[in-house]
A protein has these predicted regions:
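Ubiquitin system architectures
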Residues: 2-83
Length: 83
């Protein structure tokens, strides 16, 4: 399985994480996994009411939830925001 290392910012809890993402998973599934992981890492402090979106930090553009990581511009070192 191919993976990329990204830097994830979560502004609501003012935290950042370095996370490996599998390139064959859809962005929608990645968001679900990231939400669960951040919730656990923040000891339950991060609990979004609705499904968050994933954005590219540099371009501020949201990612299409229907494509895979491989089909997006997410590469090693990409900085993402989970809002």
């Amino acid at each position: 399985m191919s993976r990329v290392l990204v830097k994830l910012y979560v502004p609501i809890i003012e935290e950042k994480y370095y996370i490996w993402l599998p390139t064959n998973k859809k962005i929608y599934n990645i968001i679900i996994s990231l939400t669960k992981a951040v919730n656990e890492l923040s000891m339950g402090y991060y609990t979004p009411i609705k499904s968050p979106m994933l954005y590219n930090k540099l371009s501020s553009t949201p990612y299409d939830v229907n494509i895979t990581v491989k089909e997006s511009d997410i590469r090693n070192g990409t900085e993402l925001i989970l809002i």
